[in-house]
Amino acid sequence: MEVYNDYNSNLTNLFFCVKERPLALITELGFLPLNSRDDFDAIYRQLKCEEFDDEYLAIELELADKYFSPLHAKAIKALLLKRAQRGNVRRAANYYKLIRYSFSGAGKSFGGKPCNIRNFFADIWRCSRRLENVVIENKDFESLLAQYDRPDAFFYCDPPYYNAECYEVEFTARS
């Protein structure tokens, strides 16, 4: 079993969309122009606000109530909400562009070398095939280790660099 885990939800959402929705991600990337610092700043602000809508979510939630018993509908709706949060293609496309067009791929400031986003479509497709049997998680390391620890498990944990400025999530000396 292979598991990819990161505490950064934007990164795990991107990997989830590459794995589960590569064609939708490629399509969305084609519709999101990024040609200037202003475009970069707009995407950066949008990602900070975390305001992304799944246009079909409301319909799917209604259908769950209509076609399933209340107990089953509740479970299905919880799964739909979790999937919508993890599988947000627009958010993934924005994050991908942010890291591709930023200085050192950090996603903080505009300054990457010019490139055509369409050149990355084949990479996304290949990555999707590679991730086919990989479980993608967004957990802290303790929860992940507790869930997947087995006698034959191998873990590589890239530790956070304490007091570094390059992380989207906060780390303390104990985490």
Give the location of each predicted region.
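Residue-level preference for short coil/turn positions at secondary-structure junctions
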Residues: E132, R150-P151
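Conserved SAM/SAH-binding loop
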Residues: K139-S143
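Short conserved loop adjoining the S-adenosyl-L-methionine
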Residues: L144-D149
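Conserved acidic-Pro-Pro-aromatic motif
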Residues: P151-S175
